[in-house]
Amino acid sequence: MAVFALIPAAGMGKRMGASINKQYLLLGGMPILARTLEVFERSPLVDGIFVVIPADEIPFCREQVVERHGFSKVRSIVAGGAERQQSVLNGLRAMEGTAGEYDVILIHDGVRPFVTEDILGRATATARENDGALVAVPAKDTVKVVEDGIITATPSRETLWLAQTPQAFRYGVIRAAHEVADAERFLGTDDAMLVERLGRQVRIVLGDYRNVKITTPEDMVLAEAFIKEKLP
């Protein structure tokens, strides 16, 4: 069974407040997206990479990210949709004819550059034996359910996990889940949710608190500290 990475990076990054989309901001001298792709390019597990970005950014991404950094595993750069879910579906459809039904697809945020080879390996192994694998970390803070500014519930922290990526599935499973959601016009908050609603079980894989998604200026400060430790 082959393993393919699907990297959605079609977001506009409004919360970052930058003049360019967040995936192209420099982190240790390289665009964040390039840092992320580098992990999958170097991984012996990964056979190919599909990147999903806004249609008007495809030439820039090809020249300034993929070709400039020599990412030979990138099979296709796909135009994204209005929502992340549509972008992932576009990527899955682009894999048709390349990915087999039982091949593993690692869906990973383009602005989450600190994922490790260990996490990729455990997510892949879990997806091969289950309906899906969700990388996550236990919640450290108490979480409150709030309605109209009033606390209505305090879930047990022991049952709460914070979802990260990659989220890993066999191609046939995740393609079917996305096609059903698209047909029913259902918009989920992540890929695992679409698989769960079909009655399938997704198993948790322990992630890493450093596997952050860079969304805000505060995240960028944290990422810069991490990259300083990582670089020689």
Curated annotation (Swiss-Prot):
The gene is ispD. It comes from the Bacteria. Catalyzes the formation of 4-diphosphocytidyl-2-C-methyl-D-erythritol from CTP and 2-C-methyl-D-erythritol 4-phosphate (MEP). Its EC number is 2.7.7.60. One of its GO terms (biological process) is isopentenyl diphosphate biosynthetic process, methylerythritol 4-phosphate pathway. This is 2-C-methyl-D-erythritol 4-phosphate cytidylyltransferase. Keywords: Isoprene biosynthesis, Nucleotidyltransferase, Transferase. Pathway: Isoprenoid biosynthesis; isopentenyl diphosphate biosynthesis via DXP pathway; isopentenyl diphosphate from 1-deoxy-D-xylulose 5-phosphate: step 2/6. The record marks 15, 22 as: Transition state stabilizer. Belongs to the IspD/TarI cytidylyltransferase family. IspD subfamily. PANTHER family: 2-C-METHYL-D-ERYTHRITOL 4-PHOSPHATE CYTIDYLYLTRANSFERASE, CHLOROPLASTIC. The keyword Transcription does not apply. It comes from Geobacter metallireducens (strain ATCC 53774 / DSM 7210 / GS-15). The record marks 157, 213 as: Positions MEP for the nucleophilic attack. It catalyses: 2-C-methyl-D-erythritol 4-phosphate + CTP + H(+) = 4-CDP-2-C-methyl-D-erythritol + diphosphate. GO terms for molecular function: 2-C-methyl-D-erythritol 4-phosphate cytidylyltransferase activity.
